[in-house]
């Protein structure tokens, strides 16, 4: 079926409201909203088109997780902003892709299943239906034919396919490592999902526990992830947060030889100039040296065990710096001095190398540790003026090198750093290096409701492991599921409880987990992917959602990518955006996408608070349901109010009573459409204000400054309402201008003005700059320096005309009566003054 992009509007405008038909102060029948929504759907008004030679705009919302609670009024704020831009750009003759879908895997549905016994798939579908109903009621111009959910079988297939691309590149690998185990959720959490030692979701305690995990090597692209932010039109705060999370540091890696001739202890430091002040070395409890020593030293073994239960935050924030001596020493790389090794939990095994050279004179943590354990402090950086007094606390600023040998002493900190790195390189014990705070992404989850990881392993067994016979899985030989066997689907399951087995509930589904091929037994991976997986690439699938042969075609990707406008909450400033950029850059390096970045422009809508100024939540009882607002005032009123509350990015409290202001504006626009007269002449003042309004609204919409655009349209509508004879042209322009923000009202007014076509693809109004210029000004008329009247006069009026108009004022005549005008002062546009005696 071919859609007509200029389908005829409904045959008749909605009849005037019957008594009682209006709601919330709306003076016209709100049935027009359902009417126009049905029209758009019936005529496929917003089905995506891609015309040769036309420019495109890809407008995308961060798609929602369909929770059971549905939307509250804060959610549609960003959706309204993106919809305004999609509608606006269609009227500017762009081809627009504006889709919507559902981030539908995740813990909440699984936890609900554990509590109620209802399968996550059932609750997810019910929640999606409710969300979709709410979004449709608000008149958003989504192309629903491209709707997708990350739980769709066809979508899961391609998510797994991308994982295998990462696996093929060595960017997805297994690692036995300490992870954040949350027994309450029965899964491993990423560092980003933990707040103050508790799970972000549910607030359950988190402990460190060694576990086999799938990890994505995001650090391999750390440099690009940081550097390539520069070309993006993103909020500066978001880019700063991403750079901080990546944490690029320039410094040096230094190798300390162990006394016994074993493997060097390597450390990274940004202050190589302080190397001569190192008095001991600290390794994390997870470090290989600590593990080796712990095999024969009970004190070290006990300390390692105690540390295992602490979170990274607990370890780094503790004021008392605990630790135990390892009983071994390392050799200073330049002096040959022996430095004792300590095991301490303020060093984290997954940060850097898991070891630090301790310079207590110039590092606060090292200073505290040295003070607690009686270790020496050696100052090697003096104040910039050369002062080097005994220290009562660590001196961490730049200064001048001292006590560092003749080749380094006297050098300022930057030069001292370079010199020490040079000396290390000559000795073969170090080199300049860039390090990152960013750690590789722990990707696996021990849960049910997620994409199965498409990997299997060889199994050794003398029986049938599906029947409970003994078996052994060789996890050292991961094999990718062949592409033709994708997707690996989840098995049906009734018991979703994770239990005490860190492998998760899928490990209990023996008929699914184990299978035979070519006479051999194999075991599927029982870990699933995190909720982040589906949201890492959904923007690509929207470009080609019906493709069963590819995740997307090269033609579709080139036609639509990158996303031109991405709208979503600032809470995703780091995680989702960083992960999606990582996947995209891998795909780019494989030649599977044509752009280096997925999202060109990013906008964060500000949070809408409850009327009490607090974040909306059920516990506070301050949640406002958009269904109630739409029922009482209509979708257009809600859209206009949310955009009129203040700047899009600002945090704003919801005040239902203030909707009345935009309702008055709606009523005025509707009333103007009823009385517009095609035969009435367009006066100069009205024409000028019309062009000024088109100019201002156009600039404001381009800048996503919707509150000021609405304000200007209110000014214009007030002017039009005051005209005795109302021409049709300015009302038509107003209907077009208001339509992206209040689309039902815009369509209805357009039809009332005699147009048969929907205005969805009508050209956006143009303004004439020359007609925006004010030709008249209001000037004060003075008599002997005191203002006695005001007159309206052409800005460039001649002196004779100005004198005649000013003198004609009754009040001016009063103060000139009986006096002789000695002088007339006139500066066009500025001063009119009679000097009289």
Features from the language model and the residues they span:
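N-terminal catalytic cores of NTP/NDP-binding nucleotidyl/phosphoryl-transfer enzymes
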Residues: 48-118, 147-162, 269-270, 274, ...
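Helix-rich, typically C-terminal accessory recognition domains appended to large enzymatic cores
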Residues: 103, 168-182, 432-463, 628-798, ...
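Conserved oxyanion/phosphate-binding beta-strand-loop segments in alpha/beta enzyme cores
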Residues: 12, 16-60, 90-99, 121-132, ...
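Basic, alpha-helical terminal appendages of large translation-related enzymes
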Residues: 1-56, 284-287, 297, 356, ...
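NTP-handling and nucleic-acid-processing catalytic cores
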Residues: 28, 32-37, 85, 158-377, ...
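Alpha-helical recognition segments enriched in aromatics with Gly/Pro capping
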Residues: 328-334, 338-351, 380, 504-650
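Conserved phosphate/anionic-ligand binding catalytic regions in large, soluble enzymes, centered on
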Residues: 265-286, 441, 447-449, 453, ...
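Residue patterns forming the tRNA-binding/recognition surfaces of aminoacyl-tRNA synthetases
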Residues: 11-19, 25-28, 34-35, 39-43, ...
């Amino acid at each position: 079926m071919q859609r007509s992009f200029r389908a005829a509007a409904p045959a008749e405008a909605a009849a005037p409201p019957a008594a009682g038909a209006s709601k919330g102060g709306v003076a016209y029948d709100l049935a027009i909203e359902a009417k126009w929504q049905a029209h758009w759907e019936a005529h496929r008004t917003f089905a995506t088109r891609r015309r040769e030679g036309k420019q495109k705009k890809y407008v995308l919302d961060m798609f929602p997780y369909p929770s059971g609670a549905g939307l509250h009024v804060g959610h549609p704020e960003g959706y309204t902003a993106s919809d305004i831009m999609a509608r606006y750009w269609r009227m500017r003759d762009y081809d627009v892709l504006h889709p919507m879908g559902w981030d539908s895997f995740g813990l909440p549905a699984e936890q609900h299943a554990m509590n109620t016994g209802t399968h996550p798939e059932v609750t997810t579908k019910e929640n999606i239906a409710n969300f979709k109903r709410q979004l449709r009621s608000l008149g958003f111009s989504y192309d629903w034919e491209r709707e997708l959910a990350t739980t769709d079988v066809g979508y899961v297939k391609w998510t797994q396919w991308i994982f295998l691309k990462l696996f093929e590149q060595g960017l997805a690998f297994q690692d036995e490592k300490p992870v954040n185990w949350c027994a309450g959720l029965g899964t491993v959490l990423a560092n980003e999902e933990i707040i103050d030692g508790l799970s972000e979701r549910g607030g359950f305690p988190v402990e460190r526990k060694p576990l086999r995990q799938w990890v994505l090597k995001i650090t391999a692209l750390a440099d690009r992830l940081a550097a390539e932010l520069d070309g993006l039109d993103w909020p500066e705060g978001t880019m700063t947060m991403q750079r901080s999370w990546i944490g690029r540091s320039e410094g040096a890696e230094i190798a300390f030889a162990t006394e016994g001739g074993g493997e060097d202890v390597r450390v990274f430091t940004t202050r190589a100039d302080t190397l001569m002040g190192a008095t001991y070395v600290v390794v994390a409890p997870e470090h290989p040296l600590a593990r080796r020593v712990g095999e024969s030293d009970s004190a070290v073994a006990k300390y390692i065990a105690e540390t295992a239960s602490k979170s990274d935050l607990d370890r780094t924030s503790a004021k008392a710096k605990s630790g135990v001596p390892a009983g071994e020493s390392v050799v200073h790389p330049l002096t040959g001095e022996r430095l004792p090794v300590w095991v301490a939990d303020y060093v984290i095994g997954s940060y850097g190398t898991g070891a630090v050279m301790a310079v207590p004179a110039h590092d606060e943590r090292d200073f505290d540790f040295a003070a607690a354990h009686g270790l020496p402090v050696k100052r090697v950086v003096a104040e910039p003026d050369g002062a080097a007094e005994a220290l009562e606390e660590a001196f961490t600023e730049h200064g001048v090198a001292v006590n560092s040998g003749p080749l380094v002493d006297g050098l300022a900190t930057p030069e001292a750093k370079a010199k020490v790195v040079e000396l290390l390189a000559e000795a073969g014990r170090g080199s300049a290096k860039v390090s990152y705070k960013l750690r590789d992404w722990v990707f696996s989850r021990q849960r049910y409701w997620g994409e199965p990881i498409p990997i299997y392993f060889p199994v050794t067994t003398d029986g049938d492991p599906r029947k409970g016979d003994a078996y052994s899985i060789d996890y050292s030989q991961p094999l990718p599921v062949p592409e033709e066997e994708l997707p690996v689907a989840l098995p049906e399951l009734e018991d979703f409880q994770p239990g005490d087995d860190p492998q998760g509930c899928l490990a209990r589904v023996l008929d699914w987990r184990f299978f035979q091929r070519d006479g051999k037994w194999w075991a599927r991976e029982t870990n699933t992917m995190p909720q982040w997986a589906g949201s890492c690439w959904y923007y690509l699938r929207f470009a080609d959602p019906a493709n069963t042969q590819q995740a997307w075609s090269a033609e579709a990707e080139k036609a639509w990518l990158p996303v031109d406008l991405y709208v979503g909450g600032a809470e995703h400033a780091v995680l989702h955006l960083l992960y999606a950029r990582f996947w995209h850059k891998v795909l780019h390096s494989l030649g599977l996408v044509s752009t280096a970045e997925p999202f060109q422009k990013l906008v964060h809508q500000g949070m809408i608070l409850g009327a009490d100024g607090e974040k909306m939540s059920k516990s506070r009882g301050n949640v406002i349901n958009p269904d109630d607002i739409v029922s009482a005032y209509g979708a257009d009123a809600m859209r206009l109010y949310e955009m009129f509350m203040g700047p899009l990015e600002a945090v704003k409290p919801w005040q239902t009573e203030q909707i009345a202001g935009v309702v008055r504006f709606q009523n005025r626009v509707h009333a103007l459409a009823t009385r517009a007269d095609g035969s009435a002449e367009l006066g100069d003042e009205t024409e000028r204000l019309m062009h000024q309004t088109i100019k201002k609204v156009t600039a404001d919409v381009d800048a996503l400054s919707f509150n000021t655009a609405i304000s200007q349209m209110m000014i214009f509508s007030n002017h039009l309402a005051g005209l005795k004879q109302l021409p049709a042209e300015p009302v038509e322009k107003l209907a077009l201008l208001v339509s992206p923000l209040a689309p039902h009202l815009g369509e209805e007014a357009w039809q009332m003005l005699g147009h048969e076509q929907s205005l969805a693809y009508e050209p956006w109004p143009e303004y004439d700059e020359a007609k925006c210029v004010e030709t008249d000004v209001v000037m004060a008329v003075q008599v002997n320096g005191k203002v006695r009247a005001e007159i309206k006069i052409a800005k460039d009026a001649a002196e004779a005309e100005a004198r005649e108009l000013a003198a004609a004022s009754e009040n001016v005549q009063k103060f000139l009566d009986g006096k002789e005008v000695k002088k007339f002062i006139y500066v066009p546009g500025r001063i009119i003054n009679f000097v009289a005696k």
